[in-house]
A protein has these predicted regions:
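Short secondary-structure transition/capping segments
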Residues: 38, 124-128, 133, 185-190
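Activation targets extended, charge/polar-rich intrinsically disordered C-terminal tails
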Residues: 5-12, 142-191
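Glycine-rich catalytic cores of cysteine/serine-nucleophile enzymes that process amide/ester linkages
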Residues: 47-113, 140-149
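Generic N-terminal initiation segments characterized by hydrophobic and/or small/turn-forming residues
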Residues: 7, 24-26, 32, 94, ...
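N-terminal accessory segments that precede or flank the first globular/catalytic domain
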Residues: 2-79
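Active-site nucleophile-His-acid catalytic modules used for acyl/amide transfer and hydrolysis
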Residues: 54-57, 107-168
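Short linear motifs in intrinsically disordered/low-complexity regions
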Residues: 15, 20-23, 44, 77, ...
Length: 191
């Protein structure tokens, strides 16, 4: 048996820019369980839900990195799987990660974490704000007034982003570090 040592000539690959996220590159794979194990309270989970209404299509096409049209915030990791808070018409819905992931088009998920603030005092203040927002949401699950606008308030107060920021704009922001961007599947779920 002979060993093949020659290689085809190719151009070197350069690192893709931060906003080059909707490419045809090979995506990493993960299960819902491994994604759940790496999720922390305060993380943002991005998905693409097929557009059903004109408001669903907003920000879905056009600029690079606009593949995501929905995001949720991890608000609890104490149970079997993380609980995701997602903005809905009139209030915030709470659902398990597996149900949130099951809605995605093509299985693509991005998990992003807030970048640490530059000073210890700023880190404490942001962490305290995030905890207050999440505690108010979870402590008043049946108070619709408290549940209204949670995601927009969280994005504004904790991430310092505009209340009306699109998921694509949040993904490209410098306030988040991308922990996972790939395809997530649930082996227990029929295809």
């Amino acid at each position: 048996m002979t060993t093949r040592t020659e290689t085809a000539a190719y151009e070197s690959h350069h690192t893709a820019p931060r906003d080059a996220r909707d490419t045809d590159r090979t995506m990493p794979l993960a299960t819902v369980r491994t994604l759940a194990a790496s999720a922390h309270v305060g993380d943002l989970v991005f998905i693409r839900v097929p557009a059903k209404a004109p408001r669903d299509a907003a920000g879905a096409t056009g600029s690079t990195g606009a593949w995501a049209n929905r995001f949720g915030i991890v608000v609890d990791t104490s149970g079997d799987e993380p609980v995701i808070a997602e903005s809905a018409f009139a209030w915030t819905k709470l659902m398990p990660l597996s149900r949130f992931v099951a809605r995605t088009d093509g299985g693509r998920i991005a998990l992003a974490r807030r970048v640490a603030a530059p000073t210890t005092d700023a880190q404490r203040q942001i962490h305290s704000t995030a905890e207050r927002r999440i505690d108010a949401l979870l402590g008043n699950r049946f108070n619709l007034r408290t549940r209204r606008g949670f995601c927009a308030d969280y994005v504004s107060d904790v991430l310092g982003a505009d209340r009306d920021a699109t998921p694509a704009a949040l993904l490209r922001s410098d306030t988040l570090s991308l922990e996972f961007d790939g395809i997530v599947f649930d082996p227990g779920r029929p295809s």
